[in-house]
Amino acid sequence: MSVPAFIDISEEDQAAELRAYLKSKGAEISEENSEGGLHIDLAQIIEACDVCLKEDDKDVESVMNSVVSLLLILEPDKQEALIESLCEKLVKFREGERPSLRLQLLSNLFHGMDKNTPVRYTVYCSLIKVAASCGAIQYIPTELDQVRKWISDWNLTTEKKHTLLRLLYEALVDCKKSDAASKVMVELLGSYTEDNASQARVDAHRCIVRALKDPNAFLFDHLLTLKPVKFLEGELIHDLLTIFVSAKLASYVKFYQNNKDFIDSLGLLHEQNMAKMRLLTFMGMAVENKEISFDTMQQELQIGADDVEAFVIDAVRTKMVYCKIDQTQRKVVVSHSTHRTFGKQQWQQLYDTLNAWKQNLNKVKNSLLSLSDT
């Protein structure tokens, strides 16, 4: 990628121009280049570039892009420390101020580097931090498939991989990207092994709470398969998750009565939990019964007769259940409901359905062939 330069001259003259510019803005830096070479010049320029970032004039972006362009022509072994220093400056400088400029500079640096250079990890983490600080996560690449590829390209250690995914998760949460955040957290927890799963207790705990709190999340069985979550078996948080995976509303009510302080400590709201568990209980009922009486719904969902219709309307809006109300016979007629868990039985049902479709299509095909022969 081509990165704009401050001025089209030799690297040494460019460094001298940068020194002179920074000096004119009040930086404590010599106007003479160092005898140690370009990487020493850049180290001193980066150290003094705070005065440049404080400027509001139109030259700032050109000046900083000149620093970036000089960084990119250095030998890889001389780049890392300087890039880390510049990234630290851009992340910490008056957090929240001039976010567009800081994002642009980091983006230029990131995309200008060789795709397999490990220090891109540092730049990407800095991009995430700046984007999160100003609610601009949508302006940087965060697609999970791409992030997986970068993790592989950069040959990250397990610790750095976990740091990156955790940082990305927190940024997505802060920027209200709950669906993307959940996928990243599942990726993070899925990267642990039997040997280090115990180290992920905090992440697993946070993942469960975040999922239960998410108003648009209703399916949780995939979390139970994650090794760090399995490590929590026997703890209250795991018991609570299990209730949301497959139990009914009555089980949650009993759990809450016995563990009210625990629920409150998680930051979960009881009424929101009740609303979600009513829907989950209804989903389970709808899978097993194509017709459900109002009386049964009132009993199982712990709602009044006047609340049944409003509840059904809200349930249909989630698209987890498709049904209609029969007021005359005081019942709900179900056309489809999403399974709360997807195990062997559900796979068999899916296989049977697809196989039936295949057989029906073959019959149609044979009928059409017989017609064409006549």
UniProtKB/Swiss-Prot annotation:
Residues carrying Phosphoserine: 2, 152, 367
Highest taxon of source: Eukaryota
Annotated ranges, domain PCI: 180-339
Biological role stated in the UniProt entry: Component of the eukaryotic translation initiation factor 3 (eIF-3) complex, which is required for several steps in the initiation of protein synthesis. The eIF-3 complex associates with the 40S ribosome and facilitates the recruitment of eIF-1, eIF-1A, eIF-2:GTP:methionyl-tRNAi and eIF-5 to form the 43S pre-initiation complex (43S PIC). The eIF-3 complex stimulates mRNA recruitment to the 43S PIC and scanning of the mRNA for AUG recognition.
HAMAP family: eIF3m
Family to which this protein belongs: Belongs to the eIF-3 subunit M family.
Assembly with partners or alone: Component of the eukaryotic translation initiation factor 3 (eIF-3) complex, which is composed of 13 subunits: EIF3A, EIF3B, EIF3C, EIF3D, EIF3E, EIF3F, EIF3G, EIF3H, EIF3I, EIF3J, EIF3K, EIF3L and EIF3M. The eIF-3 complex appears to include 3 stable modules: module A is composed of EIF3A, EIF3B, EIF3G and EIF3I; module B is composed of EIF3F, EIF3H, and EIF3M; and module C is composed of EIF3C, EIF3D, EIF3E, EIF3K and EIF3L. EIF3C of module C binds EIF3B of module A and EIF3H of module B, thereby linking the three modules. EIF3J is a labile subunit that binds to the eIF-3 complex via EIF3B.
Protein name as it appears in the record: Eukaryotic translation initiation factor 3 subunit M
